[in-house]
Structures are given as structure tokens and as C-alpha cells.
Amino acid sequence: MRSWITHSEAETRALGAVLARELAPDGVLLLSGDLGAGKTVLAQGIAEGLGIDPDEVQSPTFSLIREHRGTGGGRLVHADLYRLDPEETAALGLEELLAGPGVKVVEWAERLPFPVPGATALRLARRSAGGREIREETN
């Protein structure tokens, strides 16, 4: 399993852009971590790597799911499950969405009530020494 240390939002965003190039065109990235761990910043970097304006990617906590399209045809579906319980998450139809086209990034993925085979799972955490640790985990 891989892990990275980032020391700023800019480094976290840059890592997201690198990871975007590694994802399949219909890949799924599952992000877990505490509030303020950098999940949305990493998602902004993913967007940038897909040719989407990263400033368009905001924490979708209040709208739950947002879709973004890049100038080069890249598609990003960004979901935030923070305020949902597993029953509410199941009612959203996320299984179909995650199987659909485009790169999917799910924040608070630990709230998914089902496994996502083939997805890349990352756990983000603040470090006591500063910065963030992003660790790939078994999905």
C-alpha cells in the first residue's frame, strides 16, 4: 500500500492531480478521514487532473452529489456522504451512480452501506507534526 505526506493544501491538490492520471476513466476513489483532513482539497486536485476547474469543486455536503465536466470531456462525480446514515445512502442509488461513466470521488466513503469492488480507497489524516498523511487502504 502506498502513502504520501503533504505539507500544504497546494501539495495535497497536486497529489490529487497525479492520482487523477492513474485512475481509469470510470474509476472510483473512496476518501475517508476526519473533518478538515483534506478530502475536498484532494478532490479538487483530481478535478484539475481531469481538466476541470478545481475551484468548481466544493464540499457538496449540502447537495450530496455534484457532477463536473471538463473542457476535454472529463467527467467527475463528487459525492459527500457526511450527513447521511447508511439507510439514506442506500436510497440515493449510489450503486448505479458508481457503476456509471466518469471518475467518481466519494467523501466519507466509510458511510457506504456496500463494498465497491475495484475502487481505490484513501484515508486522510492530519499529522501532529503538521501536514497530512494520505494512505492507500484495502477496499
Feature locations, PLM:
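Phosphate-binding P-loop
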Residues: 21-26
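N-terminal pre-Walker A segment at the start of P-loop NTPase domains
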Residues: 1-18
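Short hydrophobic/aromatic beta-strand immediately N-terminal to the Walker A/P-loop
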Residues: 28-30
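P-loop (Walker A) phosphate-binding loop of NTP-binding proteins
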Residues: 32-34
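Conserved nucleotide-sensing/catalytic segment adjacent to the nucleotide-binding pocket
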Residues: 52, 61, 65-108
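Short phosphate-coordinating micro-motif centered on Lys-Gly-acidic
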Residues: 2, 87-139
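Conserved lysine of the Walker
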Residues: 39
